[in-house]
Amino acid sequence: MAKQIKFDSDARSALQEGVDQMAKAVKVTLGPKGRNVVLEKSFGAPTITKDGVTVAKEIELEERLPNIGAQVLKEAASKTNDDAGDGTTTATVLAQSVINAGMKSVTSGANPMDVKRGITAAAEEVVTHLRNQSDPVEGKDRISQVATISANNDDAIGDLIADAFERVGQDGVITVEEARGIETYLDVVEGMQFDRGYLSPYFVTDSEEMEAVLEDAYILIYDDEVGNMQDLLPILEKVSQTSNPLLIIAEDVEGEALATLVVNKMRGTLKVSAVKAPGFGDRRQSMLEDIAVLTGGTVISEEKGYRLENATLDYLGQADRVTIDQDNTTIVGGEGSEEEIEARVNQIRQQIANSTSDYDQEKLQERLAKLAGGVAVLNVGAATEPEMKAQKALVEDALSATRAAVDEGVLPGGGVAYLRALESIEEVEVENEDQEIGVSIVREALEAPLRQIAENTGHEGSIVVQKVKDGEGDFGFNARTEEYGDLLDQGVLDPTKVTRSALENAASVGGMLLTTEAVIADLEDEDDDDGGGGGGGGMPAGGAGGMGGMGGMGGMGGMM
């Protein structure tokens, strides 16, 4: 297909046009009094949102060259969202300011490479300043403040997220799901839970709840199938002498072995239950090792020289309580050593850091949570489907921002952290006048977020910026109350990770567009039904989630 090519200022002007259109739609959502954006859907009701990344994802421009500029700006927003979970609108505002000021200077004859070097040097100095000024997040109240701000000042959501962090800890898994009703509430699963249920309903000890509950249980962990009862018999005899119940976790328990276990359970000879091992392939082996570390047991594996018929009580793990239903097994109070659990947790953290796969990182994070904390589910309710979608996106953003705050601390919000970082730019060393222009571009951009927040509130941005600059420390403009004061004391906070990532990505995208000398795109086609908007592409589709466990079969009881 024939292409169109634009060079120099023509290329940059076309890109800038797309940047401005994208930024104009996104930046109106910034701040507690940001405006709504209505998104048309191909089917169903339109979506009404104040979420910057949701707006950005929807934008595809009709003209191909401006659309490329819009998609490049979208990358700055999306990268910030990926890195820190929030800050997409701030990144958009910063990037637009850098790009527009940079385009003016390059058009006036400045060397774009030197301008870019100045931008990069200034941004790095500001990031260092932000890290040094960061205030660690400790305590439920501070976490609630951060979550509330990220949730567009919804106190109820902020309190729920703070409760979730308090219950499962920093390493716990917190997920967001759609509730079946209109209430938003928190569910917490303590201990280690995996998606495998009992292999026979005859293992149930609580017929009302249809659960098998084992107190002070031994746990046998075997990485192969159990079919021959003779292999299992020696360890069963040893456990029966202790009067403690036994949970068997194996690749499968079938035939004679399962039938014998059921008979012994029904006769009261042995308190026992059996479940399939969680996971598949290599991940199954890793999860069995996790269970062994948590409970102080050993994975019985012939590959490692352990045989089931030679197993002793020393091989078995122990837990205060095991609860098994048709679909899940939950182990609470595992008696593994704290040192070994901590070492295993650190090992998984390292694997997360080294992994390049989003899916692998997600599964590793789940394993980490099962060992180190627990699993909390925020169930989001709403009266209508559009409201549900918007509310869920809001909670997900707030959760991500809160995680970022716990990771790297917080700074005064409302754009104040950027203004206080202006002094650090004076220390940037430059080699020529064009690099100084790059530094000045960042200096100007640092004022843009507060200016936009003030304008969205209905105030004159320049006046608000000057008044805050005249103050010191955490003094700033609280857009929610439309008053000036100490923002940290008022709970107006931004996660350092979000503030930092927004500037880093804005500077990166800005420098890239300023040094663009040519743009190549398909020719405009009047007969093209899609309007030519697909050039830049939106976000790639997320990877499909795991298949989940198949649950217990539950039908083996007929062998009685």
Curated annotation (Swiss-Prot):
Listed Pfam families: Cpn60_TCP1
GO biological process: protein refolding
Region (Disordered): 524-546
Assigned keywords, A-Z: ATP-binding, Chaperone, Cytoplasm, Isomerase, Nucleotide-binding
EC numbers on record: 5.6.1.7
Localization: Cytoplasm
Gene3D superfamilies per record: GroEL, GroEL-like equatorial domain, TCP-1-like chaperonin intermediate domain
GO molecular function: ATP binding; ATP-dependent protein folding chaperone; isomerase activity; unfolded protein binding
Top-tier EC class: isomerase
Biased composition (Gly residues): 532-546
Domain of life the protein comes from: Bacteria
Cited InterPro entries: Chaperonin_Cpn60_CS, Cpn60/GroEL, Cpn60/GroEL/TCP-1, GroEL-like_apical_dom_sf, GROEL-like_equatorial_sf, TCP-1-like_intermed_sf
Assembly and binders: Forms a cylinder of 14 subunits composed of two heptameric rings stacked back-to-back. Interacts with the co-chaperonin GroES.
Family, per entry: Belongs to the chaperonin (HSP60) family.
Protein name in UniProt: Chaperonin GroEL 2
The gene coding this protein: groEL2
